[in-house]
Each structure stands twice: as structure tokens, then as C-alpha cells.
Amino acid sequence: QRQMCIRDRCVSEMALAGFTGSEVGNKYPKDPAELKKALDLRGIEICNQWFSSFLITKPLEEVEKEFRAQLEFLKAMGAKVIGASEQSYSVQGQEDTPVFGHKYVMDDEEWDTFCNGMNYLGKIAKEEYGIALTFHHHMGTVVQDPDEVERMMANTDPEYVSLLFDTGHFTYCGAEPLEMVKKYVNLSLIHISEPTRPL
């Protein structure tokens, strides 16, 4: 009951602030009918949901099964985008592990497995569900630094994989977001955050 009150207050305040879209929060109901009812009441639609892929540490069939389940949920919600982040060997959220110099670095074979897997998932999402796969580069993951984003974008099919451009993660890596955004035209979503300046 308390979780429901927190969730309802959160989406109510979003609506009052003028927002008409939301990503799927981790406290949102897992039942699409229940979630849709709560959001429709407030005029809010789902625009995206995080998907944790494990393309270099799990069998592709297992990743695909989890991916399809999430696509079914998003399709029921009327969403058009799914945001994937490769979580194999991720140190994201490990507060005692520095993300610079201590995160996992893929070898060439793992890069091929990862990029081919993203293309495969993106094709499923687009052709079978009408949903676009966008990739979220993230601190502590195998695609964190600008050169890793560049390699991922260069080795995936733009028809099936786009970039979720995150200003905060680029800034944290020492990159200038305005310069980085000029490099990529294949963007589906943008996360705007500034980790170095007080609000």
C-alpha cells in the first residue's frame, strides 16, 4: 500500500509539472493493465524502459527470451522504444569500485558477439514488435567511454540500433556533450543530466 502511494504521488507530480511521458520506474506495477490505468488517469504515456542485456556472458537464447518478455510489456503499454544497456561484468552501482581503470574491457571477439547480438535484438524489436532499440552508454559498463560508444555505433546496424544519448555519462567521462551530439545523427532518446554542476 505504501509503495502504491509513493508511485501514485510520483506520477501525479509528474503530470502536474506538465510531463506527458515517463520511462518505466522500478516501483511501477509489472502488470501493464494496472500501470496503464494509473498513467492514463494522469495523461502520461510510457516512452522507454531499461533492458539489461548480458550478450557476452549469457546464451543468446536466454537474453532473447528476457528481451521478448519486456517487448511484450512495452507493446501492451504502447511504447515505441526500449533502451538496452550491456550489463555483462558491469561495476555499475558498486560504490567501492572506481569506474575508471577498474571496469571490464571487451576483447575483439566479445565486441563482435556484443554488436552482433545488439543487431539481432534490434531486428526482433523493430520487425516483430514495432519498437526501436536504443543503446544506453553507461558508467561502469563495457560501453562507457566515448571511444567505446564510437566503436559500438560503427559496428551496429543503424536500421536496428540507435543511441540513447546521455549528457551526464559523456560529461563524467570528460567529453563535451555538444561536441559528441554532432557526431551522431542516429539518436532515439536523450537523457539530459549534469553531474558536475549544482542545480
Region annotations inferred by a language model:
Residues 60-163:
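Active-site acidic/histidine proton-transfer and metal-coordination neighborhood
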Residues 2-6, 190, 194-199:
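Single conserved hydrophobic/aromatic residue that forms the stacking wall/gate
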Residues 25-27, 51-54, 87-89, 138-140, ...:
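Active-site beta-loop-alpha junctions enriched in small/polar residues
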Residues 33-40, 141-158, 173-183:
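Distinct, well-ordered alpha-helical segments
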